[in-house]
Structure formats: structure tokens, C-alpha cells
Regions:
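Iron-sulfur-associated redox domains of electron-transfer enzymes in respiratory
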Residues: 1-115
């Protein structure tokens, strides 16, 4: 059963492993459910970019931005534990995202009881 639940993930959720994927998922939901809300996103890849982005945020230069930071350039799909080339991982992930039957989660999420 856990396997089938895994495959039912939304397209937005499936894209989390790629740099920019978390922010993109949030932006898609906001655009769908709150179209009048403007979304400003700043994302950083790699520790140096993350540090720079956090410094800018601390200085007040990114006020109102949704900030996403991925420690590995390219995101988790390009991390130290990966065993396939990054371009193949991106291509495979894009296909996995596209094949989701649900692009984004419903506006009203149902409660899930954990055992």
C-alpha cells in the first residue's frame, strides 16, 4: 500500500528534488487558488548561493520573497548520493512529474490519520 500511495503524489510534489521544485510547487498552488496574489521567488543552489541569499534576506533586500535554498547545485537529484548523470535525472524527473494524474494538491486537504 505504501508503494501505491507514493505513486499518487502530485506533479508539484514529485518535482521537489530538483532545484527550484519546492518553490515552483508553492507558486503553482498560489497561482491556481489565489490568482490575485503575486508571488516573488528567490531560489539558491549550492551552499555559497544559499549563504548569499540568506545574507540578502537578513539585510532586508528580499522582503516578501519566498526563499528556497538547495545545498546541492541542481538540487537533491544532483547530490552526493546520486548514481546517474544530472541531465538524465532531470529528464527522468520531468517525465515523472508530467505523468502525475494530479498536478497540484486540492485546495482543501483532507485529514490523514497516522497509525
Amino acid at each position: 500500500e505504501a508503494e501505491s500511495s507514493f505513486h499518487d503524489a502530485t506533479g508539484a510534489g514529485r518535482g521537489y528534488a530538483c532545484a527550484g521544485g519546492v518553490a515552483e510547487a508553492i507558486e503553482k498552488c498560489i497561482n491556481e487558488y489565489y490568482p490575485d496574489v503575486e508571488v516573488s521567488i528567490e531560489h539558491a543552489e549550492g551552499l555559497a548561493e544559499c549563504k548569499k541569499t540568506l545574507t540578502l534576506a537578513k539585510a532586508g533586500r528580499l522582503n516578501g520573497c519566498l526563499i528556497e535554498g538547495m545545498g546541492c547545485p541542481g538540487g537533491c537529484i544532483a547530490g552526493a548520493g546520486t548514481n546517474i548523470p544530472v541531465l538524465k535525472a532531470k529528464k527522468d524527473l520531468a517525465a515523472y512529474v508530467k505523468n502525475s494524474t494530479t498536478p497540484i494538491p486540492p485546495k482543501e486537504l483532507e485529514e490523514i490519520e497516522l497509525e
